[in-house]
């Protein structure tokens, strides 16, 4: 197991279908101690159902700097240092995903960018003092960042911003021997995807475009995440890794 006794923070587990949960499972399979964050008490109830009894759960609302700071202070007090961070958090108002891009509201734009992109910067700011040399930060993105995907409007813009943030963070943190990368995951029926209009059609079309005509799983994304967090990925810096069964090829 290549993550034996490593402490890794996983942000964004909503339920058992979450990509973040696939990441957490893969990390645990490789021996990591997973620390979960949750937005509020309602979300905590979902995480409790999945986490092991002795796992550390910490409240962290990424819309609040004070909440992020408090979360990482708690993590520091409980485990000392960490060896990885998985950022699987995104949000946009449903009405900002479909229709005309030119109709996106200022408030909707700012909210999506704040939660989906800026949060990676904010979380990294407070996590950095805890991260050991050799640590890996991984975030989740999607093909809609670089192609115009129907009904993905605002989130596509936010994901493009997120991917650029990955590159700049990777450049900054390389001096501290901390790697930052992103995973561009294929369309999977998660809670987040169900907010996209005609999501069943999106998933069906995506699956048809894979060379083997089958969709990617949260476990496959999770395995790549575990690799990127680990020392095995020491040469992978500032990259966006496609884990979509080849959808991006066509």
Swiss-Prot record:
Site (Involved in acyl-ACP binding): 197
CDD domains referenced in this protein's UniProt entry, alphabetically: ENR_SDR
InterPro entries noted in UniProt: Enoyl-ACP_Rdtase_NADH (IPR014358), NAD(P)-bd_dom_sf (IPR036291), SDR_fam (IPR002347)
Domain of life: Bacteria
Pfam families: adh_short_C2
GO MF term (any one): enoyl-[acyl-carrier-protein] reductase (NADH) activity
EC number, as in UniProt: 1.3.1.9
Activity regulation as described: Inhibited by triclosan and its diphenyl ether analgues.
Record key words, sorted: Fatty acid biosynthesis, Fatty acid metabolism, Lipid biosynthesis, Lipid metabolism, NAD, Oxidoreductase
Pathway connected to this protein: Lipid metabolism; fatty acid biosynthesis
TM region(s), chain numbering: none
Positions of substrate binding: 92
Record GO biological process: fatty acid elongation
Positions of the catalytic residues: 142, 152
Catalytic activity field: a 2,3-saturated acyl-[ACP] + NAD(+) = a (2E)-enoyl-[ACP] + NADH + H(+)
Binding site for NAD(+): 12, 18-19, 39, 61-62, 89, 159, 188-192
Family affiliation: Belongs to the short-chain dehydrogenases/reductases (SDR) family. FabI subfamily.
Subunit structure: Homotetramer.
PANTHER family the UniProt entry points to: ENOYL-[ACYL-CARRIER-PROTEIN] REDUCTASE (PTHR43159), ENOYL-[ACYL-CARRIER-PROTEIN] REDUCTASE [NADH], CHLOROPLASTIC (PTHR43159:SF2)
Role according to the record: Catalyzes the reduction of a carbon-carbon double bond in an enoyl moiety that is covalently linked to an acyl carrier protein (ACP). Involved in the elongation cycle of fatty acid which are used in the lipid metabolism.
Protein name, entry field: Enoyl-[acyl-carrier-protein] reductase [NADH] FabI
Gene designation: fabI
């Amino acid at each position: 197991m290549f993550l034996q006794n490593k402490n890794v923070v996983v942000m964004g587990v909503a339920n058992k279908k979450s990509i973040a949960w696939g990441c957490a499972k893969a990390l645990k399979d490789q021996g990591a101690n997973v620390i979960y964050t949750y937005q509020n008490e309602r979300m905590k109830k979902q995480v409790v159902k999945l986490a092991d009894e002795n796992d550390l759960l910490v409240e962290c609302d990424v819309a609040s700097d004070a909440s992020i700071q408090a979360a990482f202070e708690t993590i520091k007090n409980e485990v000392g240092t960490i060896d990885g961070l998985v950022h699987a958090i995104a949000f946009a108002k449903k009405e900002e995903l479909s229709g005309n891009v030119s109709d996106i509201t200022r408030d909707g734009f700012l909210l999506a960018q704040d939660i989906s992109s800026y949060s990676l910067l904010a979380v990294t700011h407070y996590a950095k003092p805890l991260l050991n040399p050799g640590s890996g930060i991984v975030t989740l993105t999607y093909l809609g960042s670089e192609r115009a995907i129907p009904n993905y409007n605002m989130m596509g813009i936010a994901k493009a911003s997120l991917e650029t943030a990955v590159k700049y963070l990777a450049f900054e943190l390389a001096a501290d021997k901390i790697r930052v990368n992103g995973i561009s995951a294929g369309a999977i029926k998660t809670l987040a995807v169900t907010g996209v209009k005609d999501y069943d059609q999106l998933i069906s079309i995506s699956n048809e475009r894979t060379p083997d005509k089958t969709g990617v799983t949260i476990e496959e994304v999770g395995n790549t995440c575990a690799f990127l967090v680990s020392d095995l990925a020491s040469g992978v810096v500032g990259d966006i890794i496609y884990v979509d069964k080849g959808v991006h090829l066509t």
